[in-house]
Amino acid sequence: MYSVIKTAVVCGFESLPVKVETDVSDGMPSFDMVGFLTSEVKEARERVRTALKNAGFRLPAKKITINLTPADVRKSGTGCDLPMAASVLAAFGFLDEHILSNYLLLGEVGLNSSILPTKGVLSAAVLAQKEGMQGIVVPWENAREAAILDTVKVIPVKNLKEFVQICQQELPETCFYREQQEIWKTEYDVDFSELRGQPMLRRACEIAVSGMHNLLMMGPPGSGKTMAAKRIPTILPELSREEKLELSQIYSLCGLLEQERIIQNERPFRIPHNTVTAQALVGGGKQPHPGEISLAHHGILFLDELAEFKPGILDVLREPLEEKKVHISRVGGS
């Protein structure tokens, strides 16, 4: 018995398509997983097995083998739990995998069979749109985030039993409710007009914004440098929908999107501490993640007390300032 379910894994700032293959055969009962997996993905074996038991699915004593392909892509995160569980259920005949052939599945599974929220749902929804897929199945808490895209059907689920019941019926035609006009609204808590006095500083900020220049502010403490910098995003042009979506994908991968504000509508203002490391500033790590420069994309990166930063940290800024991009090389890719 064989089944395949489609999902996605995060790689850098985007999601890559992954297939979850499950084979069930006779032999010594076992549950094996392969496919270049990180520790959190390997731990899904116990989560999925226990969740299926607590959901009321009694699996026969068989040899179960799960493969996540392509094998040369490192799989990380907990979003593969739901597609693994679905693939096992399909292999044992509890649901028809062909119903889900045009859907992307993403979600973490709890031991009580509940479907828990995960990171990178918006990026996975964008991937589903690019691949021409019909929809995406996500945890209920991530539904509003995935529903940003009009062309992708979003099916939210709360637990495995509900998921199987939905799959056994005809998948709903209606998506999760979208408040399209509200989610794209731009609102700032501050405004540049609140900056009183300081005509030279105001003029310098306006010139820097007009030409998209870098700006160096010097002055005694309490003269209004930080106050002015925090209000610069309010006089920048409003982000386009494409820019908002691109920025929201970055924040989704970092788990920074709020349930109440699923779109990053405002230009970001990032102010790292002067003790920040090079990795935290430009991003990186064994599993590359965005740094402060990437989180300030389309916005403002404010280095307060510039002289307090280590020279090596300031040297790291040279390439991003000149090339307008961050390039990180790792053993597994760049």
Model-based region annotation:
Residues 170-207, 211, 238-293:
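P-loop NTPase nucleotide-binding/switch module
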Residues 1-216, 220-227, 329:
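Peripheral, non-AAA+ core regions of ATP-driven protein-machinery
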Residues 216-261, 318, 323:
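Walker A/P-loop
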Residues 218-220, 286-293, 306, 323-334:
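Conserved Walker
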Residues 134, 213, 297-300, 323-327:
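Loop/turn-to-beta-strand initiation segments
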Residues 47, 51, 84, 123-127, ...:
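Alpha-helical scaffold elements adjacent to nucleotide-binding pockets in ATP/GTP-utilizing enzyme cores
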Residues 273, 289-322:
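Conserved AAA+/SF3 P-loop NTPase catalytic/coupling segment centered on the Walker-B
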